[in-house]
Amino acid sequence: MQVATRFTQVSVLALGIAAAMASGQAQAAGFQLKENSVKAQGRAMAGAGSAQGDASVVVNNPAVMSTFARTTVQADVTAIDLSFEFRGSGTAAAGSPLQQPLSGGNGGQAGGLAAVPALSLVVPLQDRFEYLTLGAMVSAPFGLATHYDHDWVGRYHGVESDLVFVDLTLAASVELSDRFSVGFGAIYEHAEATLSNAIDFGTGICANPQTTSLCFLPNPVQGPYGPQRNDGFATINGTSNSLGWLVGMNWRPSDRLSLGYTYRSEIDHEIRGSADFTVPANVTPIFASTGQFVDTGGGADLTTPSTHSLSATWQASDRFALMAEATLTGWDSLEEVRIQYENPRQPDTAEDYLWEDSWFYSVGGEYRFSDSFTFRAGVARDDSPVSRPFRSSRLPDQDRMWYALGLTWSASERLDISANYVRIQMADTPEVDIRSTSGSRLVGEYDGGADLYGISAQYRF
């Protein structure tokens, strides 16, 4: 029997690659990760693109590498403890005669604990190349991980969402004068995506005029088909490799003031992989003639956003420094994601996101208590790119506030050990009212926040 194409498109729609970029371990707005420097995190990222002595400038502003006098290697690890829980209810076949409450719980703790590592190297050259400094860094600029219970009330909107971007950045800086340097870098980015959700085949069958009669045999209560009675499952996996670039400038108008600007390019990805469908045995014959909902290859194109960052560090005294940072992230690159399948009978699916550009602002400071210990703190506001009409169970995003503390122990002339704690919380309670065109509606709100614990070691040769 021919099942409506509209149901086919909508059922798989929730599996869009962009939907996987929704919420979770991402601890900056959208699916951005800023956890590339324990020192900078201790100031809520203030001064990340202008402060000296932090090898993560390879990606935060490669021009600052010119201020390094020694070859430096740095390893950072941040543990993200995300608390993320839904409160609300849902309706299957909303607005139709078959309407009924969605079964299932709140999905459990959708967050969890995840580690974000970073490794950086800065190498100042000597002799005739003394104005040139090289750098390399492995980092994760974007990512998320959320896992709901398989039978939760919002299972038709999303169950598992994993997205990982890993960058290898090779950079160089040139000192044009004692006060001014420029830097540039090439980015090789690897992306992996896994996402899944349940499919309410029962509602689709009952909503299609050609198969509605199956829902009333022998009656609407005991019939073989109906909303929530014939759930299937779908999982999409994909990978991609692509290239990007960044440039930076660092102006030091005095010995106490450092100003930085950094631009990171968009990176275009063609994520390709597989779409795997689990279809109930009593549903399979209905779709047999259509050739749909069978395992196939597929993928989607998406673009990670560009960023513009302004940074300032002012050494107010020999012991005290103030920092500030402002970053504009070009989330308007995420307007629509269209999934194309290798199976010619599986129609493309598309979803509008229409994200908006967003700002991140932070201020912070450092106090050098002694030759051995430096303390730091900072606060930040991270605006969400997601407006309420586009907020979903995969992205119940909201403006966020950062509250950060950190310290560095200079164990020797060559070795620094740093640690931080950051509390990230929503500026307001994110509410969702999601109506899927396949029939289900999810209404509720999210309680969420995150605790970040970071540790790093820096060694100067």
Predicted regions and their residues:
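Gram-negative bacterial Sec-dependent N-terminal signal peptides
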Residues: 1-27
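Outer-membrane beta-barrel porins/channels
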Residues: 27-40, 44, 116-461
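N-terminal, post-signal peptide beta-strand-biased segments of exported outer-membrane/organellar beta-barrel
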Residues: 23-134, 138, 172, 396, ...
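Hydrophobic alpha-helical segments and their boundary regions
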Residues: 5-8, 13, 50, 231-233, ...
